Amino acid sequence: MDYSNISYGKHVSLLNIISIVVFHADKVLIYHYLGAVPLAIYSIAFSLPAQLKVVSKMLTTLIFPKLSSSSLETIRATIYDKTLRIFLAYAAIIATYIVTAPLIFRWIFPQYLDAAPVSQALALGYLFHPTVLFSQTMFAQKRQKELYILKLFTNGSRILLLLLLLPPYGVWGAVYAFILGNALSSAASIILFRRLRI
């Protein structure tokens, strides 16, 4: 039995649990600061762009075996090109959604048309998701220290941004926090990846 793998798995599970809790913190804080109606608008606005997260999960499932079996040197040779190609695909999907969102809301959520602009803005936050390749490399290569730094920074910055932006900007503060949080997480992923040692 490989006890190092068991220990690593426990650490990853702990980090994932923390991330899940923080991911839902926006809804708790919106309800606390703004009330039930803004929470409903935000939740509905988030529901359609959030489907891109399913794409991200499928992507990580597909690439993980390759990242696990490849050397860091090999990954470095191709990761930036792959990230760019995935980014362009995401950009096309997001641009299409932004253009069609008003029509979609008139059809599916006619009573929540105010949520359409919020939803369009939230979709922009997913432009940063292709950098998941960098964090998945750290995961696949069992870089525990870097994963801890990334997760603690990402989760801490998300909470801080929500606390700073929600009171003055309302629902839009949550939108800004989501976009900025994703941008900071992506930047941290790239920086930590570049600092990995073979």
Where are the regions a protein language model picked out?
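Interhelical loop/hinge segments that connect adjacent transmembrane helices in multipass membrane
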Residues: 1-23, 62, 66-77, 196-198
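Interfacial/gating helices of multi-pass transporter permease domains
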Residues: 4-8, 12, 29-50, 113-116, ...
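Interfacial transmembrane-helix starts/ends
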Residues: 6, 74-88, 96-100, 119
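Transmembrane helix-bundle signature of multi-pass secondary active exporters and lipid flippases
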Residues: 19, 42-61, 93, 122-132
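Membrane-interface helix-loop junctions in multi-pass transport and translocation proteins
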Residues: 37-39, 98-102, 116, 145, ...
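Helix-loop junctions and terminal segments of transmembrane helices
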Residues: 49-74, 137-140
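Interfacial segments at transmembrane-helix termini and the short loops linking adjacent helices
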Residues: 99-127, 172
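Membrane-interface junctions at transmembrane-helix termini in multi-pass inner-membrane proteins
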Residues: 124-153
